[in-house]
Amino acid sequence: MNVSRKELRVLNVLAQGGRILKHKDENGRLTHVACVTPEGWQLSLCTLEVFQQLKRRKLISSVKGGPYLITRLGLQALCGSSKTR
């Protein structure tokens, strides 16, 4: 699976225990996402476009409105891309 460098870095943070938090406006539209590392740092590479690409490919998911975490498919994409480099 073709995964960009930005997506790989975000997936790597999520695999280490990070999470993606979403921010919505008063109309319920998604305006901003923040990728937070397990140490509490914010990853600047995680833009709305990267988030939408990861979600569209089902590499991340949310359970009951919680933060977005990496899925098994995301872990496979992360492990598969590290073997080719």
Swiss-Prot record:
<dbReference type="Pfam" id="PF09857">
    <property type="entry name" value="YjhX_toxin"/>
</dbReference>
<comment type="similarity">
    <text>Belongs to the UPF0386 family.</text>
</comment>
<protein>
    <recommendedName>
        <fullName>UPF0386 protein MXAN_1729</fullName>
    </recommendedName>
</protein>
<dbReference type="InterPro" id="IPR018654">
    <property type="entry name" value="YjhX_toxin"/>
</dbReference>
